[in-house]
């Protein structure tokens, strides 16, 4: 029977960075309306969503589950089980988000998708605020919960009206979603920066 040594190198920073890149691509476009959405922009954003936000998180989620089960090198931190669930689920759902954006598909089903992801986000913030030193990741999950609340409003275009000239009023939910994407994306960049410095250079910054 082989014994695997515990590892302090859980690869969460790759997931933080990948999702942060996705948010900082999607967020400004949603908030500012630039570049204006068309087929080319949607295909470009779709590719980034699939590979950066999707694949990076999915890879980390699978890696964590393997490191918690088959090769138990991360079992000293039980909160990583929640991280594995979140990275796997968020990664897979970004495959769908990115592909739908690439294809120009209807975004309304995203509104229903947001409901279970609010649940996962609340689960994450509950676990990490309780975990020792886990509040920075708790803040992240709080931001993610807000993202999915605004995703619901944006996807169903709540409050959008058709004006007398045929134009539509501003989708406030989309603007709020974009602003939240930017803020959470910046927090993800901070978590990437702080956690990498803590592990690689012995810093003691608040991080994962």
What do these predicted regions represent?
Residues 10-17, 49-50, 83-87, 138-145, ...:
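Alpha-helical transmembrane segments of polytopic membrane proteins
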Residues 34-45, 102-109, 160-174:
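Membrane-interface helix-boundary motifs at transmembrane edges
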Residues 80-148:
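Membrane-proximal helix-loop-helix units in multi-pass membrane proteins
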Residues 48-55, 87-88, 113-120, 180-184:
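Transmembrane alpha-helical segments of multi-pass membrane proteins
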Residues 24-28, 55-70, 93-100, 118-130, ...:
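Hydrophobic alpha-helical transmembrane segments and adjacent interfacial helices
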Residues 4-11, 41, 67-85, 105-109, ...:
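Membrane-helix interface and helix-disruption motif detector
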Residues 131-208:
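Terminal transmembrane helical module of multi-pass membrane proteins
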Residues 1-71, 204-205:
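N-terminal topogenic module of multi-pass integral membrane proteins
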């Amino acid at each position: 029977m082989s014994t695997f040594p515990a590892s302090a190198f859980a690869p969460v920073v790759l997931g933080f960075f990948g999702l942060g890149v996705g948010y900082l691509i999607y967020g400004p476009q949603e908030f500012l309306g630039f570049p204006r959405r068309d087929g080319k922009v949607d295909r470009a954003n779709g590719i980034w969503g699939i590979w950066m936000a999707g694949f990076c998180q999915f890879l980390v989620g699978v890696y964590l589950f393997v490191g918690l089960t088959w090769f138990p090198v991360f079992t000293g931190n039980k909160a990583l089980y929640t991280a594995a669930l979140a990275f796997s689920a968020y990664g897979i759902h970004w495959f769908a988000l990115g592909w739908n954006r690439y294809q120009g598909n209807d975004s309304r089903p995203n509104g229903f998708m947001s409901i279970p992801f609010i649940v996962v986000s609340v689960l994450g913030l509950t676990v990490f605020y309780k975990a020792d030193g886990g509040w920075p990741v708790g803040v992240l999950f709080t931001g993610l919960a807000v993202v999915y609340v605004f995703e619901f409003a944006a996807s169903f275009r709540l409050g959008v009206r058709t004006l007398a000239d045929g134009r539509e009023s501003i989708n406030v939910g989309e603007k709020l979603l974009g602003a939240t994407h930017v803020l959470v994306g910046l927090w993800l960049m901070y978590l990437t920066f702080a956690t990498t410095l803590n592990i690689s250079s012995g810093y003691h910054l608040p991080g994962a």
